[in-house]
Structures are given as C-alpha cells and as structure tokens.
C-alpha cells in the first residue's frame, strides 16, 4: 500500500472526529430536550387533574319542553364540580337520559375548558286522548302527557283507548301519516270485537266514517284521498279498509245513530 495514501486516510479520520462528536452532542441535546418537555407535560397533566378546571363546571340543556332541566341532569349523573370532564362517556350518558319515555334522542357535546351541553329531542305530540271529558296530549311513542289541554286541529282525538299497548301501536301508525291526513281525522275510536282486537273506527272531518285495523292502518289510510276523490260529495258513508276496500253508503238512521255503539 502507498504510504501517502495511508497518511491521507489518517488525516481524513482526524478531520471527521470533531464532526462526529458534534453530531453526537446535538443528538444527546435533542433527547434531553424531549425528555424535559415530556416531563413538564406530565407535570402539567397531573396538576390539571388535581385542579377544579378538570371537572365539569357548566351543564346546559337545550330542546326540552316537557322534561325539566333538573330531571335530565339527574338522569345523566353529571355533577358540576365533581364529574371529570375528559373521562365522561358521552354514549353511556346519552343512553341514561333516553330512559325517560318522553325523550326520543339525547346528544352530548363538550366545549373547552369544561362545559357540557345536552341537546334533547322529545317525542312530538300527534293526537289527544279523551278521558272523562278531559283531553291529554299523546306522543308519537304512545306516552300520554299529564297536563290537561284543549284540542286543536293538530291531530285526532282518541276515544276508548285505555289499552296502553294498543294506544302505543296506534300512535306509531298515526306518526307514519302526513300532517294533512292526520288533520283530516276528527276522532278515532278503539272498537275491538271478539274476532278482531285491532278494529278501529274513524270519524272524518269531511263527514265520512272509516273502519280499519291498527296493524295496517297507515298503509291503508294513505289511499283515503284517492278513494274519496272517486265518490260523490253528496253521498256520505262508511269506507271499509280492514281487508277489502269498499264503500257503504249511510242508511236513513245511520247518521243519527252512528256513534251510539262507541259511547
């Protein structure tokens, strides 16, 4: 090997040693800085968790009308100044609130630094229940609100609906109708017979009477506008929608006695 080449290699290595030392020093410094930053972040987290700012400070409730703010907060188990803000399980808490039969949906959102908002969607009123000449709102899931009300044109009046299960089924069927069709119904009587526990009778605002079954009511009732458009306006009667659809004109005594079998 050429002695001159050996000397060049030795010189090159000696020149690189300071650079290697500097690179190692910089790498060590970066590690130290990263460790210090991580240490301070952990300290800040520990301090944060030990201070009141890590707890829920404010709870707001929106969208509720029939369920009080206090009742919703009680159901949520969220306690201001006690519940951990970051560890709050939103889905679990929403399910707790939705145990209330008037609440259709609950949605929880968080906003910094420690505020909680509970957005409520309640079941809407779709009918009125008549009981001892007093009226109560019926919700789309069949629940009945406790306060007395005066009926308007928002929905039909339900009569003889003491069976809660059947009332709930009827409410779901009504909810499937358009608003205009619901508003065309004056009263709905629950009129079960031995062979058909789902039989109902409707008195329409246009003078017609409809007989139907709870289970098929929504689908069959959607054909009502088409049916009456084919009937003479001066001939009223009963439109049967249980099995086969057909029209039966009132007899002479039907109009006077048409509600006697329900009362």
Curated annotation (Swiss-Prot):
It comes from Bacillus subtilis (strain 168). Residues 1-32 are cytoplasmic. The keyword 4Fe-4S does not apply. HAMAP family: DivIB. Residues 124-251 are annotated as: Beta. Changing residue 192 to A: Does not affect septal localization and growth. Keywords: Cell cycle, Cell division, Cell membrane, Membrane, Sporulation, Transmembrane, Transmembrane helix. Cell division protein that may be involved in stabilizing or promoting the assembly of the division complex. Plays an essential role in division at high temperatures, maybe by protecting FtsL from degradation or by promoting formation of the FtsL-DivIC complex. May modulate the transpeptidase activity of PBP-2B. Also required for efficient sporulation at all temperatures. Could be directly involved in the engulfment process or be required to form a sporulation septum competent for engulfment. Influences the Spo0J/Soj system of chromosome segregation. This is Cell division protein DivIB. The gene is divIB.
């Amino acid at each position: 090997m050429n002695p001159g080449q050996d000397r060049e290699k030795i010189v090159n290595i000696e020149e690189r040693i300071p650079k290697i030392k500097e690179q190692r020093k910089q790498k060590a410094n970066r590690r130290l800085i990263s460790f210090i930053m991580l240490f301070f972040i952990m300290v800040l987290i520990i301090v944060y968790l030990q201070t009141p700012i890590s707890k829920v400070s404010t709870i707001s409730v929106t969208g509720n009308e029939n369920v009080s703010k206090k009742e919703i907060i009680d159901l949520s188990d969220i306690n201001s100044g006690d519940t951990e803000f970051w560890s709050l399980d939103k889905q679990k808490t929403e399910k707790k609130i939705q145990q209330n039969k008037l609440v259709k949906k609950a949605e929880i959102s968080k906003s910094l630094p420690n505020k909680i908002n509970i957005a409520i969607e309640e079941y809407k009123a779709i009918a009125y229940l008549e009981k001892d000449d007093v009226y109560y709102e019926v919700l789309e899931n069949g629940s009945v609100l406790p306060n007395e009300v005066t009926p308007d044109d928002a929905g039909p009046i339900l009569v003889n609906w003491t069976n809660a299960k059947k009332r709930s089924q009827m409410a779901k069927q009504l909810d499937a109708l358009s608003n205009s069709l619901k508003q065309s119904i004056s009263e709905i009587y629950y009129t079960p017979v031995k062979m058909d526990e789902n039989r109902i009778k409707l008195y329409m605002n246009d003078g017609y009477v409809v007989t139907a079954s709870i289970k098929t009511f929504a689908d069959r009732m959607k054909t009502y506008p088409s049916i009456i458009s084919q009937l003479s306006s001066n001939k009223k009667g009963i439109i049967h929608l249980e099995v086969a659809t057909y029209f039966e004109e009132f007899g002479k005594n039907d109009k006077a006695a048409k509600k006697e079998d329900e009362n």
